[in-house]
């Protein structure tokens, strides 16, 4: 097992990474103050791991809360089910909410914990690669709104993050690839040597080779923890973690939540960010192509939806959380391994990026 730390002073917490951690109650016990535990999961993950985690937490009074599965259920109505369950079971302020699932479950369970009786303890047990390397770390919680993704939520840090890498054995290949999009992101924004490592180990990662998988998760979590420790509430450097997300969130919203997986939309959005960075003269074509090839090798889509026009993108990006004073800020690459958040770009460059023929770009690789 490896242990990392998210350093936030009195609110610091550990990230445990290893095999078989779901069966180790001694890891969770120090982070549970009361006798009541609510495990929030979904209809897909619960049959696989809920009984196992409930047994590990056998010393506590465990309340299972099983929600419908999918991004389209990340809304007020589903969140209300968590509150209904907690109140019906008379859970008090010393309860601990445990999120068992992917990013949707982690975001909703965390938001429920932030709101319930003005805040109760919260533990992340992510079971998808994307949630293990990204959404479970850093305290972003929330739900979607019909007009925009993750528009209602709170910063609320967990007491601990427990990553059992064996849970990835039940993950569909499409979901695994979606998680690889976020791993690739770390190399692009802050760790250029990591890109070379990923190029050498991509097939091992897709085959769930344990050593490669643990190293990729550790390296990604370490990068995320460092950024969160420096900028918890995304007032500065943390926004660089959103490479590809402004374009990607527009894709998710326009196509309908859940049609494109989050990681898939981020991958296509990252290609657009690479293209715009090249058009600004910040990276060259070989660098752009290198990023696209790596996303392709991960089994990810690298062409935005053909039905989306520049006007569609602009409509959805206008409500992006990085918009300040009416100016759309974008995360772009100054060079491979260095990202910047900027609103200082010619509008015609953005329009050209949105209108680019990505099928032709990919075809010439």
UniProtKB/Swiss-Prot annotation:
Zn(2+) binds at residues 182, 245, 262. NAD(+) binds at residues 69-74, 103-107, 127-128, 140, 149. It holds the Pfam family DHQS_C. Coiled coil: none annotated. It is found in: Cytoplasm. Its cofactor is Co(2+); Zn(2+); NAD(+). One of its GO terms (biological process) is aromatic amino acid family biosynthetic process. SUPFAM superfamilies: Dehydroquinate synthase-like (SSF56796). GO terms for cellular component: cytoplasm. Keywords: Amino-acid biosynthesis, Aromatic amino acid biosynthesis, Cobalt, Cytoplasm, Lyase, Metal-binding, NAD, Nucleotide-binding, Zinc. Signal peptide: none annotated. InterPro entries: Dehydroquinate_synthase, DHQ_synth_AroB, DHQ_synth_fam, DHQS/DOIS_N, DHQS_C. Belongs to the sugar phosphate cyclases superfamily. Dehydroquinate synthase family. Catalyzes the conversion of 3-deoxy-D-arabino-heptulosonate 7-phosphate (DAHP) to dehydroquinate (DHQ). This is 3-dehydroquinate synthase.
């Amino acid at each position: 097992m490896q242990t990392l730390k998210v350093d936030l002073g009195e609110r610091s917490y550990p990230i445990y990474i290893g095999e078989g951690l779901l069966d180790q109650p001694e890891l969770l016990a120090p982070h549970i103050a009361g006798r009541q535990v609510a495990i929030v999961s979904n209809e897909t993950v619960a049959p696989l791991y809920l009984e196992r985690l409930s047994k590990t937490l056998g010393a506590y009074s465990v309340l299972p809360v099983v929600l419908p599965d999918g991004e389209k259920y990340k809304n007020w109505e589903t969140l209300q089910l968590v509150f209904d369950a907690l109140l019906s079971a008379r859970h008090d302020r010393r309860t601990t909410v445990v999120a068992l699932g992917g990013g949707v479950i982690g975001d909703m369970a965390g938001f429920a914990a932030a709101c319930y009786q003005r805040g109760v303890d919260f533990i992340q047990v992510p079971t998808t690669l994307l949630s293990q390397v990204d959404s479970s770390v850093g305290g972003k919680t929330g739900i979607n709104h019909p007009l925009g993704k993750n528009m209602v939520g709170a910063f609320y840090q967990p007491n601990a993050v427990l990553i059992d890498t064996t849970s990835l054995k039940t993950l569909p290949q499409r979901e695994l690839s979606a998680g690889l999009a976020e791993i690739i992101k770390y190399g692009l924004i802050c760790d250029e040597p990591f890109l070379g490592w990923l190029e050498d180990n991509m097939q091992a990662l897709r085959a769930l080779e344990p050593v490669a998988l643990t190293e990729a998760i550790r390296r990604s979590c370490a990068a995320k923890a460092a950024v969160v420790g420096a900028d918890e509430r995304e007032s500065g450097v943390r926004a660089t973690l959103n490479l590809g997300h402004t374009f990607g969130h527009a894709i998710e919203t326009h196509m309908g939540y859940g049609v494109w997986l989050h990681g898939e939309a981020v991958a296509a959005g990252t290609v657009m960010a690479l293209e715009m960075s090249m058009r600004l003269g910040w990276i060259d074509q070989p660098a752009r192509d290198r990023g696209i090839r790596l996303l392709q090798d991960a089994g990810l889509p690298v062409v935005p939806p053909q039905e989306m026009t520049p006007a569609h993108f602009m409509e959805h990006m206008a409500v992006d959380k990085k918009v300040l004073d009416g100016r759309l800020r974008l995360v772009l690459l100054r060079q491979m391994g260095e990202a910047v958040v900027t609103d200082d770009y010619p509008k015609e460059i953005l329009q050209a990026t949105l209108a680019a023929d990505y099928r032709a770009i990919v075809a010439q690789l």
